Amino acid sequence: GNAPAADMVLKAPGDAKMTKTAVP
């Protein structure tokens, strides 16, 4: 998804977490 680099690090392991940082 499209998010700041900081959030991407958390999403890298799995897009499943992206739902938490998808807003920003």
Curated annotation (Swiss-Prot):
Question: GO molecular function of the protein, one example?
Answer: metal ion binding
Could you list the residue ranges that cross the membrane? none
Q: Which processes are annotated in GO (biological process)?
A: anaerobic respiration
Which UniProt keyword terms apply here? Electron transport, Heme, Iron, Metal-binding, Periplasm, Sulfate respiration, Transport
Query: Per the record, which residues fall in region Disordered?
Result: 1-24
Q: Name one GO cellular component term.
A: periplasmic space
Q: What is its main location?
A: periplasm
PTM section of the record: Binds 4 heme groups per subunit.
Cellular compartments annotated = Periplasm
What's this protein's function? Answer: Participates in sulfate respiration coupled with phosphorylation by transferring electrons from the enzyme dehydrogenase to ferredoxin.
Name of the protein in question: Cytochrome c3-2
Q: What is the protein's species of origin? A: Nitratidesulfovibrio vulgaris
